[in-house]
Amino acid sequence: MLIFFFIFFFLSFFIYFYFTNELFMYSYLQFFLNSQFFYYFIVSEVFFFGGVFWSLFWIIFSYDSCFFLSLSLISPFGLALFNTFLLLASSSFGCLFHVNYLNNIHDINLIFCILLGLLFLFNQFIEFNFCFYTISDFSFCSIFFFGTGFHGFHVFVGLVFLIFCFYSIFYVKYYFIFFINCSLLYWHFVDVIWLFLFNLVYIFIFFLYN
């Protein structure tokens, strides 16, 4: 069943970079060269979530399979898959907004980007409330809620940045290109982290023990 995990893993990243790579890579290249501080911040976040993924792998290969078979694992084909499509679509709208913004076109793509992010948080809240286990049940449950919950916090922070961008562009008429670039780059980083979480916490575990 692991073949399904690898199919979903590579397919999800292929879809993400196919729809976003050409839209924003050329503008972010110069941004990376001129903003080392924010680059280091993103790298530190990568190491943080790397610790979460390392803990997950340690639990997977340290516990007996009966441990996971005793859990009612969450299906990856429900809200988790829907949330993945939401973030992919939100990221695409963010890229379209950025390209149009560079051409002095102020459209509503940023609104769609924000609304899809809010819907993601709402669905995540619903999933937590109807989950079959709690954060204090097992070690895997703690990693599951910590990883997805902290990612949800990053989504919330990213939405705050995007809402401020929307407000400053359409109402204040005064904004910094650096802040817009940081906000959108942070949003894409949140999307990539979710792809790892979705493939490891949902797909990998589900197909490994079902």
Roles of regions detected by a PLM:
Residues 1-210:
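Core, highly hydrophobic multi-pass alpha-helical transmembrane subunits of bioenergetic inner membranes
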